[in-house]
């Protein structure tokens, strides 16, 4: 199968579409750069959108509290002022500097070219731990969910949540007011979630099934209709009627191919200097993926690092450009 090739050479290509990457895309536009952003997930927003879109964040400057998905929506509106090219469902496999100084990025879908690269991949590419039942994959994209983007789709439905951590318990509690019924199944007697959340769960109408594991999905070509649960200790089985199944077994994250790009890596993070420069000229890193003395992993810090990385990339491309940009109030 031939791989598509985008021969356009961008000023900057951002690897990772989480909040830091999205703000970097906006800032690249602000500095009149041609920007592309590549994200491995089906949507922008990184872990905010994939793991806890309905949760509130309390440590973003200027927001006493902001729902995670709302922050993502605002970031998208902001970056769309400059219409960056967005590539979703693409994982970058190789990054290679060519003889002319430009970078060649090969993903699972196509080949890209860029004058500079900014890596904002958070904790690396992450994929959900999947339900290990033979027929599970055929229901992905139907009524078996690993990501939740819209709580409303579960309104009036019988929902089974699998898992015992914070995500499983939090989703169960958030679904309780809108779903017809919510059942949570966990293979252990005790939940790993925050104590306060577990207490709320006990007081709620959520049906708790412990220690059980799902062992079989019963359905047709359209959807799962029933889930068979097995008691971990006794081996007895129960059948539950469902309209939707949500699996929260956590995520597997790793730097993956990034480790093979010749970058200086320290404790699973990319080493950068005060200009967000890596050891490869023209390649920068920002957000949780990077490390330096005094590094703090916060969204707020990533928002500060993104403009530094962009401005460094700008001056790399054009040495006559100013590192210090003009204030945004004078640009619109």
UniProtKB/Swiss-Prot annotation:
Protein name from the UniProt record: Ferredoxin--NADP reductase
Keywords: FAD, Flavoprotein, NADP, Oxidoreductase
Enzyme Commission (EC) number: 1.18.1.2
Taxonomic lineage: Bacteria, Bacillati, Bacillota, Bacilli, Bacillales
Co-factor requirement: FAD
Subunit structure comment from the entry: Homodimer.
Reactions it catalyzes: 2 reduced [2Fe-2S]-[ferredoxin] + NADP(+) + H(+) = 2 oxidized [2Fe-2S]-[ferredoxin] + NADPH
InterPro entries: FAD/NAD-bd_sf, FAD/NAD-binding_dom, Fd--NADP_Rdtase_type_2, Ferredoxin-NADP_redctase_2
Cofactor: binding details: Binds 1 FAD per subunit.
Molecular function terms, GO-annotated: ferredoxin-NADP+ reductase activity; flavin adenine dinucleotide binding; NADP binding
Ligand binding (FAD): 20, 39, 47, 52, 92, 126, 288, 329
NADP as UniProt keyword: yes
Family indicated by similarity: Belongs to the ferredoxin--NADP reductase type 2 family.
